[in-house]
Amino acid sequence: KFGQWLKEHYCLPKGVKHIQEDIVDVPTNENGVKCLVTKTYSYYADLYIDCTGFKSLLLDKTLNEPFESLTDTLPNNSAWAVRAPYRDRENELKPYTNCTAIENGWVWNIPLWNRVGTGYVYSDKFIDDETALKEFQKHLGSRAPKNKSDYKNIKMRVGIHKRLWVKNVAAIGLSAGFIEPLESNGLFSVHEFLGELIRNLKREKVSQFDRDNFTFTC
């Protein structure tokens, strides 16, 4: 909803074009990404911002930037997430996120206005997905949705790319990296990365030092 609000009330009124198409090819040249090819058109730009999530289509899949895994110290790499109803909204609607340790990981509980966002984080090295789902449902009790299709299984790539701005590609958020803590760092990292990118783009010319500094700062 936050992203939808930003699009409708901030980006579009300022002239940002929202194009919904699937990228089918990403040719490269000496500057990095040459263009983004869809089924109907090829889009050319001076700078490409990779915001493709864990897929990291531009930085990782296209430019092959090395990825430094942190799974040796942060083993959690999977999660089940679901939208759960309130049992007693008046008493359950809290202004904070609650985290609870259970058998093989921890559960986040984020009270929203009309529902609760909740999920179970674990490592698939120690427990399989189906067993983890059963543990999660047991923890939720009567709040647990009955249909498995209501649950989303997420595979997390824990670590960060060696460089976050390579040639004409700058990675933002999960496409840059992810560190699984006791609270998702997604929104914070997106905000900070964009702020740093804007500061660099205000310069008369972006140098390799600026690109390296973007990686160091972020």
Regions found by a protein language model. Give the residues of each.
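Predominantly flavin-linked oxidoreductase catalytic cores and closely associated redox partners
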Residues: 2-137, 194
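Secondary-structure boundary elements
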Residues: 8-17, 42-44, 141-146, 199-208
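Short, solvent-exposed loop/turn elements at beta->coil junctions and helix N-caps
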Residues: 24-25, 154-159
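Short, conserved secondary-structure transition motifs
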Residues: 82-87, 157-161, 215-218
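Conserved FAD/dinucleotide-binding core of flavoprotein oxidoreductases
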Residues: 101-155, 175-188, 203, 207
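Single, function-defining residue in the core of a domain
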Residues: 133-136, 161-166
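Residue-level marker for buried hydrophobic side chains located in beta-strands
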Residues: 169-171
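Active-site-proximal substrate-binding core of FAD-dependent oxidoreductases
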Residues: 183, 196-218
